[in-house]
Regions:
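The canonical Cys-X-X-Cys-His
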Residues: 43, 47-57, 110, 136, ...
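Bacterial N-terminal signal peptides
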Residues: 12-23
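Extracytoplasmic electron-transfer domains, predominantly the class I c-type cytochrome c fold
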Residues: 68-128, 136-140
Length: 145
C-alpha cells in the first residue's frame, strides 16, 4: 500500500480529535449508547449515499454498478475476516479518506468521497469530513461477518 504521508497524519489527528470530542460529550452526558448509535447512523447513511451503488447495500461488493467496473468492488463485510479476524480500522479510514491507495487497485474507480465531504463541510451543510469518515469506518467495523 502506498500512502500520502503528509495528508494521512492530518486526517488521523482530525479523526482522533473528533473521537475525543464525541467521547467527552458521551462522558459528560452519560449517554454512551445513544452516542454510539448516532455515530453508526451517520456512518450507515454515508455508506448508503456514497458506497452502496458499487459495494451493495449489504457491503458484499455486489452493488448495482459493480459489473460496470474494471475491478470488482471489495466485500466490505469481510474485511476483518480477510485480516486475520481484526478489523483494519486505520487502513480502512485512510482508504476512505483518500490517503492510502491499494496496490493493484485503479484508484480512479473509487471516488475520493472525502473531497466531496470537505466541500459539503465548507458549505456548512454537513458535519466535519473527518467525523463522517470516522463514522463510516465505525459503521463498516460494526457490520463485519
Amino acid at each position: 500500500m502506498a500512502s500520502n504521508s503528509a495528508a494521512a497524519p492530518i486526517w488521523k489527528i482530525a479523526a482522533f480529535a473528533a473521537t475525543l470530542m464525541v467521547g467527552l460529550a458521551t462522558l459528560a452526558d452519560g449517554e454512551e449508547e445513544r452516542t454510539r448509535k448516532a455515530m453508526l447512523a451517520i456512518g450507515s447513511e454515508e455508506f448508503q449515499e456514497s458506497c452502496a451503488a458499487c459495494h451493495g447495500t449489504d457491503a458484499s461488493g455486489r452493488g448495482e454498478l459493480a459489473n460496470k467496473l474494471l475491478k470488482p468492488p471489495k466485500d466490505l463485510s469481510r474485511l476483518a475476516e480477510q485480516n486475520g479476524g481484526t478489523f483494519p480500522f486505520w487502513r480502512v479510514f485512510d482508504v476512505i479518506a483518500g490517503d492510502t491507495t491499494i496496490e493493484g487497485h485503479d484508484t480512479s474507480q473509487m471516488p475520493l468521497f472525502s473531497q466531496r465531504m470537505r466541500g459539503q463541510e465548507a458549505a456548512g451543510v454537513f458535519p466535519p469530513a473527518p467525523l463522517r469518515v470516522l463514522a463510516l469506518t465505525h459503521y463498516l467495523e460494526s457490520i463485519q461477518e
